[in-house]
């Protein structure tokens, strides 16, 4: 037992100035961490507000002379989007925000007979560009 007591050497107590310096360093670190977390939270809240605002946007086709001819909401084909398109869809469609509302252009104004054209992921330009376009885009679909 005496040999065990001899092996245990008490650790020296840190001096008070060292404790104060480490405490000040920790306080400064945590204050910095809190400030950066608050900035990140404010940035994310701004993105959320932007997303929410864009979800309520309504896109209308070119103005019509008679307001009674404005399309009904079911004609707009509201389709929630899971992400931002990597490039704009081409064809007779317009979209806005992260929630896309498909709006066909007036007949005769669209090239290609009013077919939605978008290359799918992993497809090159050319023959695969229009193939399965409504499915490949995944964000906009033609409203029948």
Curated annotation (Swiss-Prot):
Annotated region (Disordered) at 1-20, 95-132
Q: Where is the composition biased (Gly residues)?
A: 110-131
Q: Which residues form the signal peptide?
A: none
Q: Which domain of life is it from?
A: Eukaryota
- Family the entry assigns: Belongs to the GOLGA2 family.
What protein is this chain from? Putative golgin subfamily A member 2B
Organism equals: Homo sapiens (Human)
The major lineage groups are:
Eukaryota, Metazoa, Chordata, Craniata, Vertebrata
Quote the gene name from the UniProt entry: GOLGA2P5
């Amino acid at each position: 037992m005496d040999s065990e007591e001899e092996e245990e050497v008490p650790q020296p107590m840190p001096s008070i100035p060292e404790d104060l310096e480490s405490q000040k360093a920790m306080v400064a670190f945590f204050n910095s961490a809190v400030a950066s977390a608050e900035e990140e939270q404010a940035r994310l809240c701004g993105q959320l507000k932007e997303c929410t605002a864009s979800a309520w946007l309504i896109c209308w086709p070119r103005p019509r002379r008679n307001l009674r001819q404005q399309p009904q909401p079911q004609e707009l084909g509201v389709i929630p989007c899971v992400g931002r398109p990597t490039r704009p869809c081409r064809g007779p469609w317009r979209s806005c925000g992260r929630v896309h509302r498909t709006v066909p252009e007036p007949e005769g104004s669209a090239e290609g007979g009013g077919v939605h054209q978008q290359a799918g992921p992993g497809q090159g330009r050319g023959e695969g560009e229009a193939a399965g376009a409504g499915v490949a885009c995944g964000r906009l679909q033609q409203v029948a």
